[in-house]
Amino acid sequence: EISACLVGSEMCIRDRGLIDGPSTYNSISNYFHQDLRLNCGSYGFEAPIQVWTQGTAKDIWTCLGPIWRGINSMKKVTIDGEEKLRGGSLVEASYMSAFRLGTYIATQFKPNVAKAIYHMTNAKKVLDTSCGWGDRLAGFFASDAEEYYGCDPNPNTYARYNEQISKYNKLLSKPKKVTIWRCGAEDLPYHKLPQIDCAFTSPPYFSTEEYNKGGELEENQSWFKFNE
């Protein structure tokens, strides 16, 4: 268990540890953002959608090949003195695993971990300065926190946040308050924020993921603005 307390202006942490939450509930935010996430490549590898729509036959086969071979349950067997791979089954996990081998898939932040952070801090008003794929937003709605403030410069995810908020609030007896600005943390109007109980985020991977590359307002992304 991890607990934290604020002493003066310094945060002290007791019982340092790791919040080891499962990825079981990733789908509650991924439902709204998966197509955008699968179109976000990195500096070294293209995203699945990029490979599928723009890649060569060889690029696409790099992904389809493992599916064809049934990557999840292949076994090494000896045939005529030679070791070969045989067997394999085509199950749902095969598809994602295969594309992970041939492309780059932007990672999610586990919503249940965000929920745990808000719970540990007894937060009612939370700040997320990099809303990303809506994972911490999902964690907020599952928590006892009441107000969520955040920002993200990506116009595509910004539009999805509105869908996400509307859908979640329809499931609650009392809608929660959410305010998100379409900008980076460096341009967030901090003077408009109330007293925040918990400021918690997952900053962009500057040297890894290229968010909204080639899209509208690409120039507002951190990897573009602060590229060295």
Predicted region positions:
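Conserved SAM-binding loop and adjacent beta-strand
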Residues: 99-112
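Mobile active-site "lid"/loop adjacent to the S-adenosyl-L-methionine
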Residues: 196-228
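Structured loop/turn residues at beta-strand edges in well-structured enzyme cores
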Residues: 7, 143, 194
